[in-house]
């Protein structure tokens, strides 16, 4: 039988000093016989997805203590990718994932906590906490702050001149700002309307993608990824998480039930998560994060598995930025993640024998929570939770409900296998002589007319240079914009490229250009945007050998990407580049701190999840 970890600092005569300090935090005599559960919060006033979390840690703590545990809350950092984007602040975003994982490990191990409730929400916080959960392998439940409501405003269509009601998100603000056909007044109106409430940005961007994937991994409660942050129903997720973690903790330490440990989800749960991601056209960043989380779990889940799944999993859901018709709030109305998993199950694409934190198996969970098969009216009411359309930073501030569920599996937000948006899913892995270890593309956001594309390389060696060239009309129809030396090592930090892709769209080139980078993309990116090119330029990858004017051929159906240059010429260029060193031809006006240099020294390639190369730490 496992021993409670907390006994290390709470039991025995020699721990009198530690107990004295525990007492100074408010613990009483009878608390020393209870499990100590860490409430891992991520409140910050910098990030709309986290601005409402301040009191939610204590909400969970009260439920833990009512259920017989001792709750101790601490915070991690949280970077807002949207605010950090487009300048050197983005260098810190991906590295913050590892800092978050480390900080959770440090706090939980230093104080010998028995279990965790992780309160996450935005882009790097959920994956960082998931990495920590797998590393620590103690009972855990994830509960997110929830998605933002979609914005809405009335704008004049620049083509038809008619006034239209437009649903909005962050990406719309970026695209319209660079589109000269819209007036300054229009831009100001969109700016004020695009992000109306607290919560993670309202489309299927990275934050919401990752929060949805926690449901597929079996580590969060149903609705975690889709109930809007403002709705009263989300409060129940926090309360249930607080009560349930005490039960899971006792199952492990008092009944030796290892099924409640996060690593017990196994390889099949990672396949389920990736299958969901492909089916819903999630962010390409999820690939990076799932690879990293699997490595922390000691699970051999690789790009090969992702490539295999991408060829057979259909796309059953299409949400912004891949369409303006639906946002996360609409996914919830259609039954949320459990509904997508239910359709995947009926298509024979799901492992349903994996454990979850709220049901013995995923099959049991689907029997209750898939609205197509459930008989539970409370579940149906739960998925009617909708947006109120009232700007606010206050959680649980409204209880609006949709008039009806979206059960249309032929033309609705979530489709059945027979009516899939496409028979192949929303993400793909491409390989070729320019990306020997692979690169990724969100096919859900690519127009069918450019699934096969050949164009002329327009080479840039920083995101800033790419943005400048796009805005100054140096990028033309038929170009493949190369943005290199922006990978995990080369950036360092693997910047997101939402501004270049948004500006390509605003210039009317969204169906006429491609962009290839060893950096990565925001979950808000759409178009022929190919990232994670591995090996990266700074590690000697062939993307560093491409020259202006080289022809590049992209074939998504056949999963290939090649620079149309002979092997002999590439070998000659490689010798030349080896002599020069694998770095930008011209110095970049970029401040790289000691912290970022340390990150670059240890980080591995994107196809390995951009995690630390632990072999470098061996004696």
UniProtKB/Swiss-Prot annotation:
Its EC number is 4.2.1.9. The active site is at 522 (proton acceptor). Disulfide bonds: none annotated. GO terms for cellular component: cytosol. Its cofactor is [2Fe-2S] cluster; Mg(2+). The keyword Amino-acid biosynthesis applies. SUPFAM superfamilies: IlvD/EDD N-terminal domain-like, LeuD/IlvD-like. NCBIfam families: ilvD, PRK12448.1. Homodimer. Functions in the biosynthesis of branched-chain amino acids. Catalyzes the dehydration of (2R,3R)-2,3-dihydroxy-3-methylpentanoate (2,3-dihydroxy-3-methylvalerate) into 2-oxo-3-methylpentanoate (2-oxo-3-methylvalerate) and of (2R)-2,3-dihydroxy-3-methylbutanoate (2,3-dihydroxyisovalerate) into 2-oxo-3-methylbutanoate (2-oxoisovalerate), the penultimate precursor to L-isoleucine and L-valine, respectively. This is Dihydroxy-acid dehydratase. It comes from Burkholderia vietnamiensis (strain G4 / LMG 22486) (Burkholderia cepacia (strain R1808)). The gene is ilvD.
């Amino acid at each position: 039988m496992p021993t409670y970890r907390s006994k290390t600092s709470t039991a025995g005569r020699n721990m009198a000093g530690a107990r004295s300090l525990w007492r100074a935090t408010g613990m009483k005599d009878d608390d020393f016989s209870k499990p100590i559960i860490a409430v891992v919060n991520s409140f910050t006033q910098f990030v709309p997805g986290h601005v409402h979390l301040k009191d939610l840690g204590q909400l969970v703590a009260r439920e833990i203590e009512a259920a017989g545990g001792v709750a101790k809350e601490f915070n991690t950092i949280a970077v807002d990718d949207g605010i950090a984007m487009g300048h050197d602040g983005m260098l810190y975003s991906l590295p913050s994932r590892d800092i978050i994982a480390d900080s959770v490990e440090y706090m939980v191990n230093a104080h010998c906590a028995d279990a965790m409730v992780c309160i996450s929400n935005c882009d790097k916080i959920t994956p960082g906490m998931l990495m920590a959960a797998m590393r620590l392998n103690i009972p855990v439940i994830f509960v997110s702050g929830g998605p933002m409501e979609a914005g809405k405003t009335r704008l004049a269509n620049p083509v038809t001149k008619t006034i239209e009601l437009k649903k909005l998100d962050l990406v719309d603000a970026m695209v319209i700002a660079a589109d000269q056909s819209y007036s300054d007044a229009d831009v100001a109106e969109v700016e004020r309307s695009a992000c109306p409430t607290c919560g993670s940005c309202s489309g299927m961007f990275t934050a919401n993608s990752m929060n949805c994937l926690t449901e597929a991994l079996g580590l969060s409660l149903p609705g975690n990824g889709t109930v809007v942050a403002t709705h009263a129903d989300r409060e129940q997720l926090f309360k249930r998480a607080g009560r349930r973690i005490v039960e899971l903790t006792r199952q492990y330490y008092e009944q030796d039930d290892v099924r409640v440990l996060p690593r017990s989800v196994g390889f099949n749960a990672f396949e389920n998560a990736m299958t969901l991601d492909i089916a819903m056209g999630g962010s390409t960043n999820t690939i990076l994060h799932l690879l990293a989380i699997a490595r922390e779990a000691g699970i051999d889940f690789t790009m090969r598995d992702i490539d295999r799944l991408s060829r057979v999993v259909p796309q059953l859901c299409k949400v912004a930025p891949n369409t303006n018709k639906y946002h996360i709030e609409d996914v919830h109305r259609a039954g949320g993640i459990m509904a997508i998993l239910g359709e995947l199950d009926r298509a024979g694409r799901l492992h349903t024998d994996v454990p979850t934190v709220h049901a013995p198996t995923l099959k049991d969970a689907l029997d209750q929570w898939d609205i197509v098969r459930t008989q539970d009216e409370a579940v149906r009411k739960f998925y009617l939770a909708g947006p109120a359309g009232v700007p606010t930073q206050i959680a649980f501030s409204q209880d609006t409900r949709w008039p009806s569920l979206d059960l249309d599996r032929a033309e609705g937000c979530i489709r059945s296998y027979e009516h899939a948006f496409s028979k192949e899913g929303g993400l793909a892995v491409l390989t070729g002589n320019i990306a020997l270890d692979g690169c990724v593309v969100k096919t859900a956001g690519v127009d069918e007319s450019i699934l096969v594309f050949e164009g002329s390389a327009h080479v840039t060696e920083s995101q800033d240079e790419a943005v400048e060239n796009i805005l100054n009309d140096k990028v033309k129809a038929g170009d493949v914009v190369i943005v290199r030396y922006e990978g995990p090592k080369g950036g360092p930090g693997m910047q997101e490229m939402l501004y270049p892709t948004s500006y390509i769209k605003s210039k009317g080139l969204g169906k006429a250009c491609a962009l290839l980078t060893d950096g990565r993309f925001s979950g808000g990116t759409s178009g022929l945007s190919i990232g994670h090119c591995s090996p990266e330029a700074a590690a000697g990858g062939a993307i560093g050998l491409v020259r202006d004017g080289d022809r590049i051929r992209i074939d998504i159906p056949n999963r290939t990407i090649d620079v149309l240059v002979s092997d002999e010429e590439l070998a000659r260029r490689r010798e030349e580049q080896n002599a020069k060193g694998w770095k930008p031809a011209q110095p970049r006006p970029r401040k790289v701190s000691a912290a970022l240099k340390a990150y670059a020294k240890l980080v591995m390639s994107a196809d390995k999840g951009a995690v630390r190369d632990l072999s470098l730490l061996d004696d």
